[in-house]
UniProtKB/Swiss-Prot annotation:
The keyword Electron transport applies. (2R,3E)-phycoerythrobilin 1 binds at residues 81-82, 84, 88. Contains two covalently linked phycoerythrobilin chromophores. In PubMed:8876649 the authors refer to the bilins as phycoerythrobilins. In the PDB entries, the bilins are named as phycocyanobilins although the modeled compounds correspond to phycoerythrobilins. Disulfide bonds: none annotated. This is R-phycoerythrin alpha chain. It is a peripheral membrane protein. Keywords: Antenna complex, Bile pigment, Chloroplast, Chromophore, Electron transport, Membrane, Photosynthesis, Phycobilisome, Plastid, Thylakoid, Transport. The light-harvesting antenna system in red algae and cyanobacteria is formed of phycobilisomes. These are composed of the phycobiliproteins phycoerythrin (CPE), phycocyanin (CPC) and allophycocyanin (APC). Cyanobacteria also contain phycoerythrocyanin (PCC). The phycobiliproteins all share the same subunit composition and organization with variations in the covalently bound open-chain tetrapyrrole chromophores. Light-harvesting photosynthetic tetrapyrrole chromophore-protein from the phycobiliprotein complex. (2R,3E)-phycoerythrobilin 2 binds at residues 47, 137, 139, 142. It comes from Polysiphonia urceolata.
Length: 164
């Protein structure tokens, strides 16, 4: 799984060198942000049901046509699958926060996602709207500390940009 640490070591090893000072500074910065990432992961993990429900509700509110016949949310089973997918991505955001790198999202969430959505007639814009809602809904300090919020929003932005 890719993280700042594994990426740094892999790059140094591929070049047949020791990690440079800037490599080590990058790793040190990553480690210093670890407490904030873990706080964000803990808050997301303990509130994931509400986060997923609110994100899904926002998605269907903005894209109500998805409940029309022939669309991604035409029946309760398909609606439940949309909420399940949002939950899956939130879990990957959680893993990304714990790992400190985008590996979980890259390996398990983003690779091929656009192709799958297009093939299954699932609008990625609706999922993106759910993640944008989650990012924009975040309230500091009610939900988490400022630095934890930065880490959480950074992970969400990475996902949003990758699916766009």
């Amino acid at each position: 799984m890719k993280s700042v640490i594994t990426t740094t070591i892999s790059a140094a090893d591929a070049a047949g060198r020791y990690p440079s000072t800037s490599d080590l500074q990058s790793v040190q910065g990553n480690i210093q942000r670890a407490a904030a990432r873990l706080e964000a992961a803990e808050k997301l993990g303990s509130n994931h049901e509400a986060v997923v429900k609110e994100a899904g509700d926002a998605c269907f509110s903005k894209y109500g046509y998805n409940k029309n016949p022939g669309e991604a949310g035409e029946n309760q089973e398909k609606i439940n699958k949309c909420y399940r997918d949002i939950d899956h991505y939130m879990r990957l955001i959680n893993y990304t926060l714990v790992v400190g790198g985008t590996g979980p999202l890259d390996e398990w969430g983003i690779a091929g996602a656009r192709e799958v959505y297009r093939t299954l007639n699932l609008p990625s814009a609706a999922y993106i709207a759910a993640f944008v809602f989650t990012r924009d809904r975040l309230c500091i300090p009610r939900d988490m500390s400022a630095q934890a919020g930065v880490e959480f929003c950074t992970a969400l932005d990475y996902l949003i940009n990758s699916l766009s």
